[in-house]
Amino acid sequence: MSEAKRFTKLIGVGAAAATLALVAGACGGGGEGGVSTGPSEGEGGGDKEITIGLIPWEEDIAVTHLWKAVLEEKGYTVNIENVDVAPVFQGTADGDIDLYLDTWLPNTHGEYWDKYGDKVEDLGAWNEGASLELTVPSYMEDVNSIEDLKGKSDEFGGEIIGIESGSGLVQTTEEEAMPAYGLEGEYKLVKSSTPAMLEELRTAIKEEKPIVVTLWRPHIVYAQEDLKDLEDPKGAMGEPESIHSIGRPGFSEDYPDLAEWIGNFKLSDEQIGSLEQTVIGEYEGEETEGAKAWLADNPDYLKEVMGDDAKGLDFSS
């Protein structure tokens, strides 16, 4: 693929894609994070300060605020940098960002991994089932595979509703899936924005009209609407991926405890779905409070991740 096969969006938090500079962006998670004013100090000396890069994707918002809640309880000062995908990798490689929690491998961020992978620390994968999808409402009983779209363009108005034009999801759909299934001359891939795609999807569902959209898992909309991903017998949308956490050079040396916790960090699809629903769906504008609420509802979770280091952490109040 020619670029990272991913996309930006922010549902229910009201934001646009962040700019291509390490500046605060317009995403709901950003309201609680500051901007780092200098290098973070490690666990062994001075104040414990850490800067986490945040892309406005649901799973990243959810897990970033999860760790913000935990680390603040452990005495860290947590700064959140709202960034786009290219600068989050460059910033981590350069040491301006300490931690980024949403690296999709091997395909979605493959281009960036080829460029920066030897300049950052891979801290491990926390989810193994991430995927890119073409998706329709479940009431479309006669469309179950991408193959079923062929010959039905009139039904869909000749459109596949996509997201941002530079996104990897759009590129995968346009460069791989549409040619593989012979849809190029029959359908137009509409490129707009993720919020616009979601609005069209919800409008179509209210009216029970046909629609096919580009989507991805994990995503909060699967918990909100009755959807089905189209089968992809040719594998054009790519194989399932792993979501990794990465750290700046020297991260494990400077933050040995945190590196161990991050290495133990795992979330199932069910867990990330419930975390997203709480953090984004129920606590818009107060995402860290949402993370605390989720931790209060899952009191044993941190014991699995942090072991004895979880003692004394109480989010029930």
Feature locations, PLM:
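C-terminal motif of bacterial Sec signal peptides marking the signal peptidase cleavage site
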Residues: 21-26
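Short, low-complexity, disordered segments immediately C-terminal to signal peptides
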Residues: 27-48
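A bilobed periplasmic-binding-protein/Venus flytrap-type ligand-binding module shared by bacterial periplasmic
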Residues: 131-141, 241-256, 277-278
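Short helix-initiation/N-cap motifs at beta->coil->alpha
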Residues: 57-58, 79-91, 188-200
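Ligand-binding pocket segment of bilobal, Venus flytrap-like solute-binding proteins
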Residues: 97-101, 168-235
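Ligand-binding cleft/hinge of the Venus flytrap
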Residues: 67-74, 155-187
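Short, well-ordered beta-strand elements
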Residues: 46-59, 76-81, 157-161, 262
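A conserved helix-loop-strand patch within extracytoplasmic ligand-binding domains
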Residues: 118-166
